[in-house]
Amino acid sequence: MTKTSLITTIAVVCSLTFLGTVGDSQDKPIKKDLKLAFVPKNVNNPYNVIETKGSLDACQEIGAQGKVVGPSDASASSQVSYINTLITQRQNAIVLAANDPNALIPYLKRAREQKIQIVTMDSDTAPEGRKVFINQASSEGIGQGQVQILAKQIDFKGEIAILSATPNATNQNTWIKYMEEELQKPEYKDMKLVRIAYGNDEDQKSFTETQGLLEAYPNLKGIISPTTVGVAAAARYLSTSPLKGKIALVGLGTPNQMRQFVKDGTVKEFALWNPSDVGYLAAYAAAQLASGNIEGKEGETFSAGKLGSRTIGKDGVVILGPLTVFDAANIDQFNF
């Protein structure tokens, strides 16, 4: 992946540097035939398909039995029945992208009481619900970076909106918090956040919400959509609109979803990490926990296959790495 443009504000040192004298699992083998289950936010989201494919690839490498189960809608209540079934099946570990930070805690605690290891990826629960959280990148950097990209495109002036996923999505709300903090800085004094809309990580609703934003705010200059479903739906709407090229759209998208919109001029830049690597890293963390090689404590290190040695940071967080910014110059170098 040459010539990638990285947002430099994202600190990844904490995921790569040994933080203490806690145990090192580097030379400890992973148990064979572990049962690892992966519960994405929803199973029909293209991003989640890529993410869990990475998880299953890791399972194949380490000789684990991996499976993906989950709801078709991105709600916490819909994830509960799957978690309960996996507890009954006595999985060794459950890897979860949470649709709510708190609603799933009682069920995850029940799983942990049954000695099932819990790892969250992509979207976290409160720390008491799991041992390790695989974070895509620094949450602060993700939020700040999207504001910075948009601000440059609109010359730091004008009304902007955010098109999010669901109102309770942990990762979305954390990133939005950092966006709002970034917008308080003096350089953004001429920018105004007029609305946060929610497309519920559904393509058609996100498409309709984009239309609604543009109708409600005729002076809108830009939209940030920190969800792969939302940013692709917004781009699809703008691509056939008279506002194509006049409204700046940035957010988090996959290159394969966004390629046509970059090439036709609808979108100049967007950002993401490799979702497959998120799932891959989460599977290795789950397997190391289930093997008794790590406990999720700050400073522990573990081997994560092709991703090398990783260190657990504060509150059990492991950061994958920095964001990559995609544009017309580099998008064809990526295929996911």
Show where each model-derived region lies.
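Bacterial N-terminal signal peptides that target proteins for export
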Residues: 1-10
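A residue-level marker of the well-folded mature domains of exported/periplasmic proteins
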Residues: 6, 20-336
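Bacterial N-terminal signal peptides
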Residues: 9-18
